[in-house]
């Protein structure tokens, strides 16, 4: 047995059991190298459809395809060893029917070898979540601000900032939990509402722009590292890597143009004649 196969990955049931316990730490990753770094400190790695923004420069996540998600899911699985890897189901891969969702989820899990999928939606997607969960597909829900619905929402804005708007979001949370999801992401929801939902439902809540009272937190890796030119209000910059990377690229370009690089220590000499 290889060393890698001997290491036990975290599972969806283990994350489910963290409700009310130690906070679940989750970050995104789309590459084997960053996955290896994230894996050392995080319980869950999300291969998010935010890769459309971060990797491909799309304005929204709508253009992301199933094949794109599977490809990056494979990379993250190869780079990580212990974290539960969750892959987003992209827009158009699950909404038409629960059967379509199952077919897409099976492709993701079989071809990437990930441990769970994530899909957006509450009450309207509850039947689909139940259908998948009953057929061996662990599902992480996603409510509040749902980026795949940008063309319906019109803009990315926080949800539930007036108490009169709480009921539909609370209903979404209950529906996802009762349908069998093992956890749910709550995005850009007013803090008091996120806190209330966390207290009211039986599965872990993973906050992103929600509340410190949530059962866990998630951020986009590039946002928290300072690699994105802009980040939402809810992002804390834990690093400022952008300027350092730019400085390194500038130094490289300057040394190439001045022929300072490569130096003698970076090239190969001839073998000594015997």
Swiss-Prot record:
It catalyses: 3-methyl-2-oxobutanoate + (6R)-5,10-methylene-5,6,7,8-tetrahydrofolate + H2O = 2-dehydropantoate + (6S)-5,6,7,8-tetrahydrofolate. 3-methyl-2-oxobutanoate binds at residues 49-50, 88, 118. It comes from the Bacteria. Its main location: cytoplasm. One of its GO terms (molecular function) is magnesium ion binding. Mg(2+) binds at residues 49, 88, 120. It is an enzyme of class 2 (transferase). InterPro entries: Pantoate_hydroxy_MeTrfase, Pyrv/PenolPyrv_kinase-like_dom, Pyrv_kinase-like_dom_sf. Its EC number is 2.1.2.11. It is found in: Cytoplasm. Keywords: Cytoplasm, Magnesium, Metal-binding, Pantothenate biosynthesis, Transferase. GO terms for cellular component: cytoplasm. Its cofactor is Mg(2+). GO terms for biological process: pantothenate biosynthetic process. Pathway: Cofactor biosynthesis; (R)-pantothenate biosynthesis; (R)-pantoate from 3-methyl-2-oxobutanoate: step 1/2. Homodecamer; pentamer of dimers. Belongs to the PanB family. Catalyzes the reversible reaction in which hydroxymethyl group from 5,10-methylenetetrahydrofolate is transferred onto alpha-ketoisovalerate to form ketopantoate. This is 3-methyl-2-oxobutanoate hydroxymethyltransferase. It comes from Rhodopseudomonas palustris (strain BisB18). The gene is panB.
